[in-house]
Amino acid sequence: MTTNPGTDNPPVDRPLTAAAATRYQQLRGHLAALRLHTAAEQLPAVLDQAASEGLSVTAALERLLALEVDATEARRLAGRLRFACLPTPASLEDFDFDAAAGLDRQLVAELGTCRYLESATNVILIGPPGVGKTHIAVGLARASAHAGYRTYFTTAADLAARCHRAAIEGRWATTMRFYAGPTLLAIDELGYLPLPAEAASALFQVVSQRYLKTSIVLTTNRGVGAWGEILGDTTVAAAMLDRLLHRSVVINLDGDSYRLRDHHARNEQLRRTTTGTRQPIH
């Protein structure tokens, strides 16, 4: 039996009566009307399989609908990933734990299950530049999207700029609802630059709206004791820390910079390629 899944033709190993052909076209029409487009496209192939494998009507229907469900979930995942705005393809699976001094692999693996989202627990990643904070944050955000959760990734500077524009344009409430919406909000690079007072206030309001409701993953290169300096207001810093740390996992990362390790590795490879010898990298 042969088919052409991309056409409207029914299976053609034997002639169909006019009534059977009509029912076949009606079935495809019903599937299309219900927006089950993958099922409509795959119907000829599944009917062929049902005939060749002797599938029952129930088994054939289950196979057809399973294809539709898989396609629907793939589209939804693609949409969640587009919305998430992840800056890199990083995942938890490709993180170099051997280079991250003292990082608890089991803890990161547990966070990768996304169970922490069920209790609106926050994750705070602290460490100097280049040790993998953003990689883990992106990995957690990617895992969240794959688990079916609405996820959004931004930087502290971008969040502040967006809130500033919203205040000027009269869209403050709408913007606050936007940041309150995702199950996981990842905020990268807090502390690289001091925030002006209005930006610190915006960040505090975002944290307050999500408090005990939804999770935040936050990366920073400054210890919590320096947040008063980052935010320009020790009172705001204390209030925000109180909300973030109330239900949280704090991960301190140390070790050599990822970017420096990559730079050294590229230099070493270049030397081997051009000279055939290995020389120490300084």
Where is each model-derived feature located?
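Intrinsically disordered, low-complexity and often Lys/Arg-enriched segments
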Residues: 1-29, 267-282
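Conserved P-loop
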Residues: 103-181, 281
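AAA+ P-loop ATPase motor domain of ring mechanoenzymes
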Residues: 62-115, 119-122, 261-270
